[in-house]
Each structure stands twice: as C-alpha cells, then as structure tokens.
Regions:
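Residue-level preference for beta-strand/loop junctions
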Residues: 65-67, 117-119, 264, 329, ...
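Outer-membrane beta-barrel channel domains
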Residues: 156-425, 432-436, 500-507, 514, ...
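Charge-biased low-complexity segments
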Residues: 5-6, 18-149
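A mature extracytoplasmic/lumenal domain signature
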Residues: 73, 85-88, 123, 129, ...
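Exposed, low-structure sequence patches enriched in small/polar residues
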Residues: 239, 330, 424-687
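Generic short beta-strand segments
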Residues: 105-106, 248-254, 650-653
Length: 687
C-alpha cells in the first residue's frame, strides 16, 4: 500500500507574551541560534524529528482516516518531552504518538528570568498529506503560527479555562444536534458506549477535545459585553478546589400557524453549574415559561391534562396552569448531583430525563415525557458499560387521584452495553414498573443492581409489576453506524407462529443508520430510521402499571400501534447550522366518540382488558391516521458557551384520520416561527 505521510502544521500562538527574559526550549543543533530565532529552530527540529519517525498504523491507512489531531505536550523543567493529551479516538494512533515522543532527545528547557520552567504546546497533526503538500506548508512558514505555549500547571491541560465544565462530571445537555457531533468521535473509538444519554463531559473529553471544538467558534472580542454575549459564561467563579458558572437562559419564540393561531413562547431561565474538587459536580436549572403553541400541540397538551383543574400538560415539560385566556404557564425545575469516586463508577441523583438508544427515537427510554426524580449508577470496565437507573413516576389521571394526590409508581432499569469487537456493540435491556399496592412503597426487591427483574416480579406477585425486555445492536463502519432496538413486552411462541395476530404478542422494532461527513462533505450528517410497534405494547391491565409518566409515553412519543419512517439531515458551518427532517407514519388511535370505548392498542394508558379483540390485531388498527411531518430550521449560534441560538423554522404537518374527532381532527397545518433560545433540551413536537 502506498506509504502515507503526515504533515505537521505548526501554528505558534502564544498565550503569554514573551519578554527578552523568556527563552524557548533549545535543541542541541539550535544552541548557537540567536534568541529571536530560537522558536523557529525549535519548531523545525521538532517537526523533522517527528516526521522522520512517525508511522501511520495499518488500520488508520485502511480506513483512509482524514483528520487533524491535536497533541498537547510539554518540555518539562528537566528538558524532557512528555505527551499530556492526544484527541484521537484511535488507540493505535495515540500509542504511536507516545512512542515517537519517547524517542526525542533531552534538550535545554525553557527559561523564565533565568530559571528553568515547564512549557506546554499544542501540536496539530494532519493526516494524511503527500510530500508536496507537506513541503508547501513548510515553505509558507505557517510554522510560526502553531505552537501554543502554556504556563499552566493543571493535571490536565485546558486550552481555554473559560470552560471548566469540559473536564467535570456534569452531563452534557442532551440535544440531538449537538450529540450528532459527539457520536462521530465516539464511534471512531474502539471501546466507547453511546446508548445511554446524557453523556458526562469527562467521558466524552477522552475522545474529542471539547475545548478545541468550542474555541473554533470563539469571536475575537475585547469588551466585557462582547465576550459575555458571544463567547463566555455570564459569571464564572473559580477557586483552588471549586468552580461554578451562572448563566441566564431564554427561549423566546414568536410565530403563526395556518390555523390562524399566533404562537409564542416566553421562557426565562437560570442555569447554575459547578464542581467541588475533581469528583463532585452539581447542576440546577429553573425555567419560568408562558406559551401558546401551534393548534395541534395545544390540542394534544389539553388532551393529556392532569386531574385537578389545570388546563394542559405541555409535552416533555410539565403541568401547565392557565395564562390569560388561551395560553399556558408552565414552570419546570431540574437539578442533579454527580459523583465519580474512581475511573469505573459514576453516581447521579436528581430530577431530569434520561435516554437509552442510538436512534432519533428510543423504544427503551426516551426524553419525550416530563422530568422525574432518578438515581443512576454508570459502571465502566473492560468492554462493558452497565447502567442502573431507578425512577419515581406518577399517574395524573382522575381515576387514580385520591384527595388531590397523584398516584405514585416506580421504575427500575438495567442496561448492559458490551463492545463485542471494535465494530459490534450489543445492549441488553430490562425494566420493571411497580406501584405502592398494599402500601409496599419503593420495593427493595428491585434495588439489587444485578438481579433479573422477571424473577423479582414473580417473587413479589405476578400482577404486582410490569416487566419489559430489550435487545439493541450497533455496528460501526468507516463513517456509517447501523443500529437497532427490539423491545418485548409480552410474547407467546405458540401464538406468534400462527397467523391469528394475538393481542398479547406485544413487541416493537427499530432499525436505523447514521452517516457522518456524508459523501465526503464535512459536517454533513444524515440519518434514516424505521420504527414499528405492535398494538397494546407498553400497556397493562393494571391502570398504574403502564409504561408512562404524567400522561406521556416513556419510550416512543407515539406510544404504540404504529409504523414510522424518519429522514434527518444536519449541516454546520462555523456558527451556522441547518436541520431538516421528514416523518411518514401510520398510527391507530381509539375512536373516543362516546359509543366505541374499546382500546385498539395505541394508547399506552388505556387498560388492555378493554381491548377490541383478542385476535386479528395488526399495526394501525382502530381509527387509522396517516401522518406526515416536514420540518426545516436554520440558525446561528450566538454564544457557544451557553448554546444560545438565533433560529427560524417552518413545520408542515398533515394529519389524516379515518374518523375525525374533537381530539384527533383532520388537519393540514403550516407553522412558521423565529426565536432566540438557549438550546439545552429537545422539543418533541413531531407527533
């Protein structure tokens, strides 16, 4: 195979301006060089040494890897080279970097006021470039722009200390647009796990230099106002063993839909994040919001309203009270603490959301429902990531409300992610839902982090809980990842092999693919996904044991009894972004017309004892609706530190049921909106 060469593009950008009393490290060949020419001599000798020694690993050649990796290294006060950090997902590439630097000779260290000091540098390495390209770069003297000397003494270098969260145990806010970037780098790694979200900053920072990614977007500003508006956290307080940031947040939107509804959202928020020491991090977010949405969203929000007189429940957010005469007021509070005592285990406790899966949707656990209290343990060792998740849920329907108090229920999840090989990942999922029947409260039988929940459910009474099982697969190619999920609620082999479509064969399937840098276009991301879930999946014959929370499904937003195909495209260029999405689907609803009260299997909250039929059940049965949703959004990142975005979007939705009802009317609507938003969670309006 043709030998590939590397080009080292050396850029010198000093963090501290050097005076005449400060001196670069000196190779032996540079000892007679004038002090003004020492930087150039140092870079030239280092570049020559690395290029002559470096050999690209075979697997990198085979995959035709084309990236620039940043090597953070130092020349210590004794004159020895040491590698501090390499932002490459390839283990072999990291090992080669360490090997090459170990061959470098001991040199004279940098001097400051005639004292030897450690000096740190950033060394970008582009792979691959041919010899001619390499020589051109050297001749152009781009060398003078590359090395970034740093006089920091941190255990781990941070190229911009304005973002301390990047090395913390905080969660990265789960937004699909941002996570598509992280997925790219994580999928390049041989032993990463991508299903359980949100990710922790310190874990992702092993595979992608988060500071470098954010620094690409920094605007040169000299005024305090310009820095805070466009680049930085509003307030950053740091001490020797702690730090915290305080940022205001907004979600300000105005728009109009074709049903002549003037839409708006007015959210004011406060985001506080911080850490005490290296192992303990905390976060709190409070939102005060008023809004009126497109007509179909308002109708859905009112259809799932809670008992107690409040007019609506905003999907994904929470219970809303009336605002003026035709809008909603919906406060939301989220907070958690995160503790990582060692490299293996992370503990989190708080109020928020979780997501399990590699797809746009999840058949296991999604972020479609309102926030809830949770306790989570993530354990990473060898090729395994094992997640334990316990959640406290509630049912807000009037038939389960007693003296104004909503009915409580509990949920426990095990998810085991195993990297079978460099390319194949298998995930095993199980969950159980139970309530406080017989005043048992939170059942300690489900606290065991390793037990099979089916056995535990049987030991506490077969009707005392609802257990689901799942299997996920992911296979990684060069820039493509293939993924799937299978969820099993109930199953009888004798009924499955027949053609009678028994109601109790309750399962769902997802298959999908992601394509990063599609067609060799940098930052173009494509995704295709298909989901199908049989009638009555996630439902139960006990009112409170369904797979739902606050009148919202916990898995797929559509509940069950549907087929769906999704296509997604995302593109970014500097601070600009564009997202497009189309959704085709067919779903069966209940009729809810006052005469037919049967469950057709699409509403996870409808008691399946009231099913329409034992046999002959197929996807889309009942009041069948064809659904098409097209969505386009373009925008600009105003501040990358807080993910503040200016955007405009248009959504087209065609909803065509066989029998229009007050709750599910036949609609053909277009919704146009513009806004300014701190993008830290997903709005899920594609239903």
């Amino acid at each position: 195979m043709k030998k590939l060469t590397l080009c080292v593009i050396l850029l010198f950008s000093s963090i501290t301006v050097f005076s005449q009393t400060e001196k670069y490290p000196v190779f032996k060949d540079c000892e007679k060089t004038s002090i003004n020419d020492l930087p150039t001599c140092f870079k030239d000798r280092l570049k020559e040494s690395i290029l002559s020694e470096f050999s690209i690993p075979d697997n990198i050649k085979q995959e035709e890897f084309r990236e620039t990796i940043n090597i953070v290294f130092a020349v210590n006060s004794n004159g020895n080279f040491k590698v501090i950090y390499v932002n490459s997902p390839y283990k072999e590439l990291k090992e080669e970097v360490y090997r090459v630097f170990s061959t470098l000779p001991k040199i004279k260290p940098a001097n400051y006021n005639n004292h030897p000091v450690e000096m740190q540098f950033v060394f970008p390495l582009s792979i691959p470039l041919d010899n001619n390209s390499n020589k051109e770069v050297i001749r152009e003297k781009i060398v003078v722009e590359v090395f970034q000397p740093e006089k920091k003494k941190e255990k781990r270098p941070i190229s911009n200390s304005l973002f301390p969260e990047h090395t913390s145990e905080l969660n990265i806010p789960f937004t699909r647009a941002e996570y598509s970037l992280y997925d790219y780098y994580l999928n390049k790694s041989e032993n990463s796990h991508t299903a359980v979200k949100p990710y922790v900053y310190s874990e992702v920072n092993k595979y992608v230099d988060l500071d470098a990614e954010k620094n690409k977007l920094i605007k040169p500003k000299s005024t305090w106002f310009g820095k805070k508006l466009l680049n930085e956290h509003m307030a950053l307080v740091k001490g020797k063993d702690f730090w915290f940031t305080v940022d205001p947040g907004v979600d300000l939107q105005i728009g109009k839909d074709s049903d002549d509804v003037n839409t708006f959202n007015n959210t004011r928020a406060i985001h506080i994040n911080g850490a005490i020491g290296e192992k303990f991090s905390f976060s709190t977010n409070f939102y005060e919001s008023q809004g009126r949405f497109a007509k179909y969203i308002n109708q859905y929000a009112e259809s799932i309203k809670p008992d107690g007189g409040n007019p609506a429940l905003i999907p994904g957010r929470g219970i809303a009270k009336e605002f003026k005469t035709d809008a909603y007021d919906y406060p939301v509070a989220e907070a958690y603490v995160s503790y990582t005592p060692n490299k293996i285990v992370n503990f989190q406790f708080g109020n928020g959301k979780n997501f399990i899966g590699d797809g746009y949707r999840s058949l296991f656990l999604s972020d479609a429902a309102s926030p809830y209290p949770f306790f989570k343990i993530n354990t990473n060792f060898w090729k395994i990531k094992y997640t334990n998740l316990w959640m406290w849920m509630q049912d807000v329907r009037p038939e389960l409300t007693v003296d104004g108090a909503y009915k409580q229920k509990f949920m426990a999840i095990h998810y085991l992610s195993w990297n079978v090989s460099k390319k194949l990942n298998i995930g095993l999922f199980e969950t159980v839902i139970w309530d406080d029947a017989n005043d048992r409260g939170f059942d300690v039988n489900y606290l065991n982090p390793l037990i099979f929940y089916t056995a535990a459910e049987f030991s506490t009474g077969s009707r005392a809980g609802n257990t689901l099982l799942g299997l996920s697969l992911k296979y990684k190619l060069k820039d493509v990842s293939l993924y799937s999920q299978f969820i099993l609620d109930e199953f009888r082999l004798s009924e499955f092999t027949g053609s009678d479509e028994w109601w109790g064969n309750k399962f769902g399937i997802q298959i999908g693919a992601k394509y990063h840098n599609a067609f060799n276009i940098e930052n173009l991301y494509l995704q295709a996904e298909y989901n199908a879930i049989r009638p009555y999946t996630y439902s139960h014959d006990e009112l409170n044991l369904n797979y739902g929370h606050n009148n919202q499904p916990l898995a797929h937003l559509w509940g069950s009894n549907f087929k769906e195909a999704i296509g997604i495209a995302r593109f970014t260029k500097d601070r600009w972004f564009a997202n497009a999405k189309i959704v085709f689907g067919k779903k069966g609803f209940d009729f809810k017309n006052g005469t037919d009260t049967s469950s057709y299997g699409g509403d996870v909250f409808h008691d399946n004892d009231h099913r329409a039929s034992d046999y002959g059940n197929e996807i889309g049965q009942g009041n069948t609706a064809k659904i098409f949703i097209g969505d386009l959004q373009v925008g600009y990142i105003v501040n990358p530190a807080t993910n503040l975005k200016l955007f405009g979007g248009i959504t087209f939705r065609n909803f065509n049921p066989d029998v229009p009802t007050n709750e599910f009317d036949k609609t053909n609507s277009t919704w146009i909106s513009v806004g300014l938003r701190t993008d830290v969670f997903n709005w899920n309006f594609d239903f």
